[in-house]
Amino acid sequence: MRYIVALTGGIGSGKSTVANAFADLGINVIDADIIARQVVEPGAPALHAIADHFGANMIAADGTLQRRALRERIFANPEEKNWLNALLHPLIQQETQHQIQRATSPYVLWVVPLLVENSLYKKANRVLVVDVSPETQLKRTMQRDDVTREHVEQILAAQATREARLAVADDVIDNNGAPDAIASDVARLHAYYLQLASQFVSQEKP
């Protein structure tokens, strides 16, 4: 068994920056979003299933998934969203387990944007939340993605609340300030997680 630290945060919170800081310290990072893209790569069985269910127009000329079109299709249709989740979630879970088993670092950092929404925090040994104010989320996401405030507000409304994320957190990184502060926070937590992982391994041994 591998000690798992789940990392989450709302859109624009800086999850990638924090994950990269852990990776720089030699920790294997398993990113749920990357895995979700991998299972629908051109030629993947799941991509064919999506095309069969939603129509061939969901596939671009280069064979890739038309993500925006699919998002728009399921956004206001719970039944279609449930169908897609039933298809993809088992595949994502399977690949996640494979990557955890292949990990070589003392603990793994599992990056899951929808950790709270899908109750996945129960699968982790510890939960780290990257926390920022909603206003910071709005500004960063508008700047990064070149989208309107209204668009970001819709995304925020569909995600778990800040309070819900903090309620499941074991550790919190406040990312409202300068990016430089992240490195020291990550270094401190890394040292702590190494201790926890070592204790976990010793308890697992017969």
From Swiss-Prot:
The entry's localization annotation reads: Cytoplasm
Chief localization: cytoplasm
Give the UniProt record's GO annotations in the biological process aspect: coenzyme A biosynthetic process
Give the CC-aspect GO terms.
Answer: cytoplasm
Alphabetic keyword roster: ATP-binding, Coenzyme A biosynthesis, Cytoplasm, Kinase, Nucleotide-binding, Transferase
Q: Which Pfam families match?
A: CoaE
Q: Which SUPFAM superfamilies match?
A: P-loop containing nucleoside triphosphate hydrolases (SSF52540)
Give the highest taxon in the source lineage. Bacteria
Give the record's pathway: Cofactor biosynthesis; coenzyme A biosynthesis; CoA from (R)-pantothenate: step 5/5
Q: Which residues form the DPCK domain?
A: 4-200
Is Kinase included in the keywords of this UniProt record? yes
Reactions catalysed, as given in the entry: 3'-dephospho-CoA + ATP = ADP + CoA + H(+)
| GO molecular function term, any single one | dephospho-CoA kinase activity
InterPro entries per UniProt: Depp_CoAkinase, P-loop_NTPase
The positions annotated for binding ATP are 12-17
Q: Might you give the EC number(s) for this enzyme? A: 2.7.1.24
Give the record's family classification. Answer: Belongs to the CoaE family.
- PANTHER family attached to this UniProt entry: BIFUNCTIONAL COENZYME A SYNTHASE-RELATED, DEPHOSPHO-COA KINASE-RELATED
| Summary of the function given for this chain in its UniProt record | Catalyzes the phosphorylation of the 3'-hydroxyl group of dephosphocoenzyme A to form coenzyme A.
Q: What is this protein called?
A: Dephospho-CoA kinase
Provenance organism: Escherichia coli O6:H1 (strain CFT073 / ATCC 700928 / UPEC)
